[in-house]
Amino acid sequence: MNQTELQQKIKMTYYLLYQNKEQEAIQQVQELLFIFQNMIQQQTREQMELSGNFALIMQQELLENFQNADMLGMADCLKEKALLFTEFYFQTRNREKNE
């Protein structure tokens, strides 16, 4: 999944969460948790050093909100942290490819 597709999926998901469309949103959050886990595992050492624990904190917060069925918490995490993480992730990957 490329950056634009992923960011669209995140935006669609937090929109569903803010609209209280629980069933649709929960499925999307599950998929995003899996995607984020894969992205975190694929990070290079340099990416991990640059991002610090941000990616792990973002994923942990999203997972905790998911487990507690906190719709607004999940939406806020996606809107504030997940979009920022994806921007950083793809920016650093593209920079590494160009070097």
List each language-model region with its residue ranges.
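C-terminal-biased regions
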Residues: 1-99
